[in-house]
């Protein structure tokens, strides 16, 4: 059909009611937010991936145990969510880059991959345990952050959650290297916040106290009986508790940031202060 004319015999300018009427079926497509969670095979990471999926995020879950990641993916998708899994070890910079550089936009990063290994005096510690903790808790976090934050800068914003520990600010006996690794996470989070401030990227450090996960079993190299004694007489936090806190902080308005969250069981006041019921 002929283009309608206005007075003077000229077609109406683009953007008028006549022009817009021809495009009334155009829909604005809003892309879902993407969340990347490291160490998602168990504990805090798994719970966080599930929780963020319920908040409408498309989840990218990473870890070393492919069968557990596949189980997580099935659970998220059965509930109507979307999940992509990537199996690699954050201790390998090459693996981090190979798996994460091809990703597109990442709106939320949860640097959760971490571990404790061993619980001995410094003069008796196993240097292999020390390497595992530093390589995972510090270098792994840095490798992932180095790949993902440029994507956030390019997109004009994002939110990074670093999972630390009260051990990062309350060193305890037999935990020198683990405490040092989490102190590094604390310092990195503070500096990262300053580095990324002008880019509109939020940085939140989560410092939990006692959380019942595989943490203690890994620390004691599979000694479940010894691991279970850590929680004797105490109702610890769960991975779901930490995930709930992350989901809450993630949905705050753009002008508001939670810099740090210290989350404790109600029976724990600090690294050295726990009330155990008989």
Question: What positions do the PLM features span?
Answer:
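Conserved glycine-rich cofactor-binding loop
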Residues: 41-42
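Conserved glycine-rich Rossmann-like NAD(P)H-binding loop of the short-chain dehydrogenase/reductase
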Residues: 57-71
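The beta1-alpha1 cofactor-binding region of Rossmann-like NAD(H)/NADP(H)-dependent oxidoreductases
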Residues: 67, 87-98, 127
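Substrate-binding pocket helix/loop in short-chain dehydrogenase/reductase
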Residues: 120-122, 126-131
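Active-site helix of classical SDR
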Residues: 145, 181
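Residue(s) in the substrate-gating loop at a strand-loop-helix junction
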Residues: 165
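C-terminal helical subdomain
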Residues: 205-206, 213, 224-272
């Amino acid at each position: 059909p002929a283009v309608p004319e206005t007075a003077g015999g000229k077609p109406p300018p683009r953007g008028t009611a006549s022009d817009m009427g021809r495009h009334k079926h155009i829909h604005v497509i809003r892309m879902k937010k993407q969340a990347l969670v490291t160490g998602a095979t168990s504990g805090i990471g798994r719970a966080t991936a599930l929780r963020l999926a319920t908040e409408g995020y498309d989840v990218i879950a990473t870890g070393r145990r492919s069968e557990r990641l596949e189980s997580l993916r099935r659970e998220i998708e059965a509930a109507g969510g979307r999940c992509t899994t990537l199996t690699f070890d954050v201790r390998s910079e090459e693996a981090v880059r190979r798996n994460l550089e091809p990703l597109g936009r990442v709106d939320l990063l949860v640097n959760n991959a971490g571990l404790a290994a061993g619980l001995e005096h410094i003069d008796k510690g196993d240097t292999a345990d020390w390497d595992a903790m530093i390589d995972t808790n510090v270098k792994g976090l840095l490798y992932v952050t180095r790949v993902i934050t440029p994507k956030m800068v390019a997109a004009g914003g994002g939110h990074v959650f670093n999972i630390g520990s009260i051990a990062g600010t309350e060193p305890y006996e037999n935990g020198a290297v683990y405490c040092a690794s989490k102190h590094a996470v604390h310092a990195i989070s503070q500096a990262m916040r300053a580095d990324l401030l002008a880019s509109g990227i939020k940085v939140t450090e989560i410092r939990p106290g006692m959380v019942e996960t595989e943490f203690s079993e890994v620390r004691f190299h599979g000694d479940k009986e010894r691991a279970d004694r850590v929680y004797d007489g105490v109702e610890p936090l769960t991975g779901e508790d930490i995930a709930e806190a992350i989901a809450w902080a993630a949905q705050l308005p753009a002008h508001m940031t939670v810099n740090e969250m210290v989350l404790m069981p109600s029976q724990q006041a600090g690294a050295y202060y726990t009330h155990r019921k008989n």
